[in-house]
């Protein structure tokens, strides 16, 4: 199974990055060691399934959930009260943690970035977030957001540390093609790739009841993002 996984990764990388397959194959079985060490940090948020970016020596954490993955029987699956509505900045060197509420942002942006299992990719000073599963108030339901949000990473980090308003550092656009959750997004040479994932609308039911619809993408989307209008616009 391990070799199949590695070969699958090699194939995907060879598609996305021409010329990488040979060098990857030469090194994928080289011996290596991996050490994981826990570092205690006061104030570190207990969240999962969030998007993140890095600027200089600080981390930016957006979205995700504050509860574990349990209690999935409707109407208790994915309670909205456990969506992470704070945005965090972490300095791993000093151990400092800052946060600010996302509730002051416009509704469209706020609801999108507080979803979970979004796809995200950082390009220079901007973090791009697509899709994600969460509560949408206009339709009064849990769904996969057909949206893309651009985040000005250094400006947001500075605003959170200084406890200043976040307005003006986020821009959100609606695009049905971005209605994906649980996939992966990368950017290579100014082209973004949205890999796999699915669209899940409704409340989860472990018995496959009628409370949701689900469609797997089974695809890799490639596109560029045009920011010239002030909004992130997708061109495929």
Regions found by a protein language model. Give the residues of each.
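Surface-exposed loop and turn segments in beta-propeller and other repeat-based domains
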Residues: 37-40, 94-111, 155-176, 233-236
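Beta-propeller blade signature
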Residues: 76-95, 142-159, 207-231
């Amino acid at each position: 199974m391990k070799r199949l996984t590695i070969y699958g990764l090699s194939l995907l990388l060879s598609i996305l990055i021409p010329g990488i397959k040979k060098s990857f194959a030469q090194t994928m079985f080289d011996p290596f060691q991996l050490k994981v060490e826990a570092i205690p940090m006061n104030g570190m948020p207990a969240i999962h399934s969030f998007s993140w970016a890095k600027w200089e020596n600080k981390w930016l954490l957006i979205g995700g959930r504050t509860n574990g993955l349990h209690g999935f029987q409707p109407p208790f699956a994915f309670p909205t009260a456990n969506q992470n509505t704070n945005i965090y900045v972490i300095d791993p060197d000093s151990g400092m943690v800052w946060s600010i509420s996302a509730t002051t942002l416009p509704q469209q942006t706020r609801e999108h970035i507080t979803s979970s299992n979004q796809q995200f990719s950082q390009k220079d000073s901007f973090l791009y977030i697509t899709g994600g599963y969460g509560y949408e108030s206009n339709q009064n339901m849990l769904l996969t957001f057909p949206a893309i949000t651009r985040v000005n990473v250094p400006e947001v980090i500075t605003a959170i540390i200084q406890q200043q308003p976040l307005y003006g550092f986020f821009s959100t656009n609606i695009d049905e093609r971005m209605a994906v959750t649980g996939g992966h997004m990368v950017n290579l040479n100014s082209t973004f790739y949205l890999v796999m994932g699915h669209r899940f609308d409704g409340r989860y039911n472990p018995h496959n009841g009628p409370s949701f619809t689900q469609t797997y993408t089974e695809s890799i989307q490639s596109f560029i993002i045009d920011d010239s209008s002030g909004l992130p616009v997708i061109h495929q």
